[in-house]
Amino acid sequence: MNKKDLEILVCPVTQSRLVLKVGEELNGEIISGLLVSEEGREYPINNGIPDLTYPSQLPEKDENVRAFYDSRGDAYDANLHLTFDTHGEDENEVRNKFVDSLELNPSSRVLEVASGTGRDSEVIASRLGDDGQLCLTDISPEMLIRGQKRLAGVAVPTTYCLSNASYLPFPDQYFDAVYSFGALGEFSDITRCLAEMVRVSKIGAKIVVGDESIPPWLRETEFAKILITTNKQFLAKVPLDEMPVEARNVCLRWVIGGVFYLIDFNVGEGEPKGNFDIEIPGVRGGTLRTRYFGLLESVTPETKRLIERAREKKDVSMYQWLEEVNRQAALRDLGEEEKP
């Protein structure tokens, strides 16, 4: 860890700034110590990597995932080529296409969540210059250390930390792009993880995520059943229900043999906005807004027929007739006059 990392890292719970308490320092690098939040929460630094994992007692699924990846660093890198070989894909070409979706420039600030051993990280790093910024985080110390070794010597300033994807230790609206491929389905709370990615992204930033999921039209094929026999994660659904309301320009496609999904989107601000006050022509009339907010209690069928005849005789829309009649009746009963 470098002291400059304090400009980026924050408490994953409150986003307050952190104070460094140095244990061991070597050539300007912090080897051990503590990061302390304004609220007094302490996060250790071990072997040069800050551990900002929250909560300290992870949900069972996340704990199991961490233990799994901590135990298979060697096998992961040695065998990952099988995923691409099975589907006749070139790993380097595929990863570069994924990173293309981030629309980076050399000065971009980029976060990779669940960066693993750095196979995508080095592609991202190759797109960034010394005025850019790359932050890599993972829940597994073993995987993150391997990624750190892979990226030794890259030009872009790089920050490494351990964290839970549900509580990212970065400030609001900081990054130009966020990337996570191959881990989303293993997060215990996908909705919260995606919301956190949005929180740390600037308005307009690009987010790219993906993982295993055989599409519905292939689920009953022999092709799918062969894959699922070895890896049940292919049964996972695409997390469309978990997508944040801030997602704009959403693109979903299937990649790597058509059995992994890739979602990319821009970050918007809050819910989408629309002009709901445009007068709608026709018998019903009104606007989208009045049709939603202006609903009244039901009337009897006989009264409804009278209203329809009266509206037709006056030759106005139903909205105009109801607005006028109800307004006049309300003012009369209240003993008030129409304001000019």
Task: Tell what function each PLM region has.
Residues R109-Y167:
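Class I SAM-dependent methyltransferase SAM/SAH-binding core
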Residues I8, E24-A78, V325, R332, ...:
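N-terminal, positively charged/glycine-rich alpha-helical extensions of SAM-dependent methyltransferases
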Residues Y54-N105, R119-V123, M143-R146, K206-N231:
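Conserved class I S-adenosyl-L-methionine
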Residues T230-R248, Y261:
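Short alpha-helix
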Residues T191-K206:
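A short glycine-rich, Lys/Arg-flanked "PGG" loop and its adjoining helix->strand segment in the class I
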Residues S166-A177:
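A short acidic, Gly/Pro-enriched loop at the edge of an enzyme's catalytic core
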Residues L306, K314-P340:
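Short, basic amphipathic alpha-helical segments that act as recognition/interaction helices
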